[in-house]
Amino acid sequence: MAVVKSSEIEKGSFLLIKGAPHIVLEREFSKTGRGGAIVRLKLKNLKNKFVIRETLKGADTAEAIEIYEVSAQYLYKDKDVLVFMDLETYDQVSLDLKESANLQDKVPFLQESEIYSLVTFDNVVIDIKLAPKIAFEVVEVEAAVKGDTVTNAMKNITLNTGLVVKAPLFINVGDKVLINSETKEYAERIKN
């Protein structure tokens, strides 16, 4: 781990703040007339996803850290444990959801045999990178009455992972759809 001056910190840098890994979301540098330089940072904790703000003076330093990404294939979920296979070493990686509460919101998007990037810090997986839009198959749709369409009417659909989202009335069982992984909302239907 390297020590960096506050003036060298850039957007996208990884820092160790109060013992936890953070990514710099925003950086604002201002130089006051008498007081010297100030760097205001907006940071996202990579373990619990909380966003904090820090202000550093010009002479302050921070600890830069290395974050690694490992390509892994999702194998299965066994109760509260996600099991992946590291594609480089072919070792199995088990992630206990009780110990990694921030990974809970990723579970509905994980599909068996798909490849994901596991973000690691200090040899511990702290995040699973998802694509912005993910393809799913519709396995169940809620019945909708066609006459109730004053505006764009939506209905609940259940996807192959169990995730339930709202989608337009024209979506049927067996259709493939793209879902926004950030908002958990329907994005579009995939044409065959």
From Swiss-Prot:
One of its GO terms (cellular component) is cytoplasm. GO terms for molecular function: translation elongation factor activity. Pfam families: EFP, EFP_N, Elong-fact-P_C. SMART domains: EFP, Elong-fact-P_C. GO terms for biological process: peptide biosynthetic process. It is found in: Cytoplasm. Keywords: Cytoplasm, Elongation factor, Protein biosynthesis. Pathway: Protein biosynthesis; polypeptide chain elongation. Involved in peptide bond synthesis. Stimulates efficient translation and peptide-bond synthesis on native or reconstituted 70S ribosomes in vitro. Probably functions indirectly by altering the affinity of the ribosome for aminoacyl-tRNA, thus increasing their reactivity as acceptors for peptidyl transferase. PANTHER family: ELONGATION FACTOR P, TRANSLATION ELONGATION FACTOR KOW-LIKE DOMAIN-CONTAINING PROTEIN. Belongs to the elongation factor P family. This is Elongation factor P. It comes from Borreliella burgdorferi (strain ATCC 35210 / DSM 4680 / CIP 102532 / B31).
